[in-house]
Amino acid sequence: MSKRGTRTPGYWYDNTPIPLPARILAPVYGAAIALRRALYRRGWRRRHGVPVPVIVVGNVTAGGTGKTPLTIALVAKLQEAGWTPGVASRGYGRDDAGTARWVEADTPVALGGDEPVLIAWKTGARVRVDSDRLAAARALVEAGCDIVICDDGLQHYRLARDVEIEVVDGQRRYGNGRLLPAGPLREPAARAQDCDFRVVNLGQASATATPQAPDDAGFGKWQMRLSIDSVQPMDGKRAQPLSMLAGQRVHAVAGIAHPERFFAMLRARGIGVVPHAFADHHVYRAADFSFGSRLPVLMTEKDAVKCRPFADEWLYSVPLKAELPAAFWVSLLDRLNKLASRQGV
């Protein structure tokens, strides 16, 4: 696992000049992905399925857009509806990326990847990491799962899917609109129009706003908002309301794709934030928290799973909940029930 994590090039989302090598490589990359997709669409490369419904949660941009909170919410909703979901993931950033394995809540992040460990910890669902998503899906079915969620698998065309959910960041959107490496796009933005559900992550939920389906102007249909209302001491003590920190200063740590979003959510709750942004998927050491002042340290749960080995009474994780409109869940579950009846699940 990279000790530094990954950082987003500034020119993807601002007016910074794009380096010449990136501009040269982008058309080459674009031709390669267009050819690859055409091979699958025309049947020259076979897609392979499993005998249960498959949901792919992904994005057409590189980097984080809110897929993990949505995946966690999706697993919880399916469990509530009587399904036994399993999650297939590549396990980005783990040390032995070529090894397939089951991920449990206590699996070391170096072996399972931060997001799969977080999903297992939050949901208790079966989680399988494998660079081959098809093999992961088959393993989940053999383990008794009656529905598979493929986390970040939109471009993994070898695995046949029944439902595609695109997630896009409501602030960054599709950046400069260019393909990798000149921009953030893994595929042309028009690819998102093929997805069954398009979710736009609008960030912080307000006390009065209810997620809804806005007019679809080609950019997301279903609003997703993120809420925080508690803090979990990482030394094992009981969770406390986030409001207890209102008016206080804290160190806020975020090693995610868009750290400022987390910092803004804390500030909106009246908390004085001393921000510490790390690269996405950063591997923490105790020394990273030598801030020179003994203030509470708040971090995302994705960061927290990597800090458990050296957690003390000063470290807190902030649970984050994805909120979507009721109509989204009704529409999705209705489609899944029809699929299940056809497949005999």
Curated annotation (Swiss-Prot):
GO molecular function: ATP binding; tetraacyldisaccharide 4'-kinase activity
Entry keyword set: ATP-binding, Kinase, Lipid A biosynthesis, Lipid biosynthesis, Lipid metabolism, Nucleotide-binding, Transferase
GO biological process: lipid A biosynthetic process; lipopolysaccharide core region biosynthetic process
Cited Pfam families: LpxK
InterPro entries, per the entry: LpxK (IPR003758), P-loop_NTPase (IPR027417)
Residues annotated for ATP binding in this entry: 61-68
Annotated pathway: Glycolipid biosynthesis; lipid IV(A) biosynthesis; lipid IV(A) from (3R)-3-hydroxytetradecanoyl-[acyl-carrier-protein] and UDP-N-acetyl-alpha-D-glucosamine: step 6/6
Presence of the UniProt keyword Transferase in the record: yes
Gene Ontology CC: one annotated term: plasma membrane
Domain of life: Bacteria
Catalytic activity reported: a lipid A disaccharide + ATP = a lipid IVA + ADP + H(+)
Protein name per UniProt: Tetraacyldisaccharide 4'-kinase
